[in-house]
Curated annotation (Swiss-Prot):
HAMAP family on file: RNase_H
MF terms in GO: magnesium ion binding; nucleic acid binding; RNA-DNA hybrid ribonuclease activity
Main location (coarse class): cytoplasm
Cofactor note as given: Binds 1 Mg(2+) ion per subunit. May bind a second metal ion at a regulatory site, or after substrate binding.
Quaternary structure (record): Monomer.
CDD domains reported in the protein's UniProt record: RNase_HI_prokaryote_like
Protein name: Ribonuclease H
EC numbers, comma separated: 3.1.26.4
Lineage, uppermost ranks: Bacteria, Pseudomonadati, Pseudomonadota, Gammaproteobacteria, Enterobacterales
Gene3D superfamilies documented for this protein: Ribonuclease H-like superfamily/Ribonuclease H (3.30.420.10)
Residues in the signal sequence: none
Enzyme class: hydrolase
Length: 155
């Protein structure tokens, strides 16, 4: 039987683009581990993706995961859009390169053999874990230490 793990994630950006951060909580049998990191120049969508990636990459074995995010971009991207992006060689329906493709590929790899249920929660609506992740993400964004090497400014 697979371990049942809960993951809660959020991303934040002070300006978009601007300094950003992510926050994630990984919970297993009442034990929690938190993750957060700040980046000097990034976007909110990249930080939402990073939160999910870092938490999933922390799992050491195959798990049954319930991952809660307030990002429709992440939830829809991974449950709906990614299949066609991959079929089209990481291009959109308009034949344009998928934005944040470096992180989408990393998230796709992080899914591994996990069984994942993606849950959308309304942000800033009093969901306790989402609020904690938001606090972690905003604190990280206010004290960025990393460079987001994959961020590409819009042309």
């Amino acid at each position: 039987m697979l371990k049942q793990v809960e993951i809660f994630t959020d991303g934040s950006c002070l300006g978009n683009p601007g300094p950003g951060g992510y926050g994630a909580i990984l919970r297993y049998r009442g034990h929690e581990k938190t993750f957060s990191e700040g980046y000097t120049l990034t976007t909110n969508n990249r930080m939402e993706l990073m939160a999910a990636i870092v938490a999933l990459e922390a799992l050491k074995e195959h798990c049954e995961v319930t991952l809660s995010t307030d990002s429709q971009y992440v939830r829809q991207g991974i449950t709906q859009w990614i299949h066609n992006w991959k079929k089209r060689g990481w291009k959109t329906a308009e034949k344009k390169p998928v934005k944040n493709v470096d992180l989408w590929k990393r998230l796709d790899a992080a899914l591994g053999q996990h069984q994942i249920k993606w849950v959308w929660v309304k942000g800033h609506a009093g969901h306790p874990e989402n609020e904690r992740c938001d606090e972690l993400a905003r604190a990280a964004a206010m004290n960025p230490t990393q460079e987001d090497s994959g961020y590409q400014a819009e042309a």
